[in-house]
Amino acid sequence: KASDTVFVHQTQIPILIERQDNVLFYFRLDAKESRMMDEIVLDFGKSVNLSDVQAVKLYYGGTEALQDKGKKRFAPVDYISSHRPGNTLAAIPSYSIKCAEVLQPSAKVVLKSHYKLFPGINFFWISLQMKPETSLFTKISSELQSVKLDGKEAICEERSPKDIIHRMAVGVRHAGDDGSASFRIPGLVTSNKG
């Protein structure tokens, strides 16, 4: 076993079909002895229609800032902007270094990164990209199987509930659409009569 523990947080937010990147998992690793992030293995649930998944990506998200020490965050910043006009569909390249990508994945996804760790807190995240024709009724379930550091399996501590189901969504408006920096969209409701 690897000597350092990897803390894992699975998101509970909608997967936007039109996005190239959607945060699926966050990873926080205090590299006291580990020097290399070798791979992360992920399993999709048996009910997942894998033909809807375009890509699964692993990103390096940087290190912990001194002012955040002790806050036990899972990300130093938001990796995908919700307010930068024209830049709300993909990871912000300044804060996201792509380490691995698997196109049209199978049920077991192996993200081989061989990424050199910095001493201290390192952040990684897994992104999910769906195909444009994916139905809004599609549901995704996934589970972390293992993380390897320096060729050894790491101890992983999950900081989120089990059996999370990720649902699809569409961003009705994005910053920059029709030349507008932002939009106010009133809440949409359905009555008992439809």
Where would I find each of the regions flagged by the language model?
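Beta-strand-rich interaction surfaces with strong enrichment in secreted/lumenal proteins
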Residues: 13-15, 26-27, 95-101, 111-116, ...
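Short coil-to-beta strand junction motifs in C2/discoidin
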Residues: 48-57, 139-140
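Predominantly extracellular/luminal cell-surface or secreted proteins
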Residues: 43-45, 58-63, 125
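A short beta-strand element within beta-rich, extracytoplasmic domains
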Residues: 35-47
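Beta-sheet-dominated interaction scaffolds and their linkers
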Residues: 1-35
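Asp-box/BNR beta-propeller blade signature and adjacent active/binding-site loops
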Residues: 21, 33-35, 97, 105-107, ...
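Short glycine/proline/serine/threonine-rich loop/turn segments at secondary-structure transition edges
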Residues: 118-120, 132-143
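Extracellular adhesion/glycan-binding regions together with long Ser/Thr-
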Residues: 69-120
